[in-house]
């Protein structure tokens, strides 16, 4: 897929993966689902679910390093700043030949890399973020999308990003 195709698909994901309602219990269920998927697959990832600025779920699975904690924070900051996936933000910056610093942000606090996805509620918008760190960025992104699609009973095959060319 090209950057433009990826950006188009991610926009579709962000629209389709919206909840009617989302509370602390739903946040915990989302985090637990990601933890179960990662454990079944032997993935060494960090998982974070944050509502507004409140951490609700965090798990670090075998293989995670202290660096992943910082990656989670920085990717989540991208979502909470722009209300779109960190991967979409990174792809757009790359397409435009820009960096986060060009937008007046610090790379120490913002990571435009895949793995954080907005938690959207219909009629409200972005209320938080679900973040995965530990895999290549496209895989982090796809895993977050997979968990959201499973929770919302959406067809993952029509939402998932295709393998890169």
Curated annotation (Swiss-Prot):
<dbReference type="Pfam" id="PF03928">
    <property type="entry name" value="HbpS-like"/>
</dbReference>
<dbReference type="InterPro" id="IPR038084">
    <property type="entry name" value="PduO/GlcC-like_sf"/>
</dbReference>
<dbReference type="InterPro" id="IPR010371">
    <property type="entry name" value="YBR137W-like"/>
</dbReference>
<protein>
    <recommendedName>
        <fullName>UPF0303 protein Rleg2_2653</fullName>
    </recommendedName>
</protein>
<dbReference type="InterPro" id="IPR005624">
    <property type="entry name" value="PduO/GlcC-like"/>
</dbReference>
<comment type="similarity">
    <text>Belongs to the UPF0303 family.</text>
</comment>
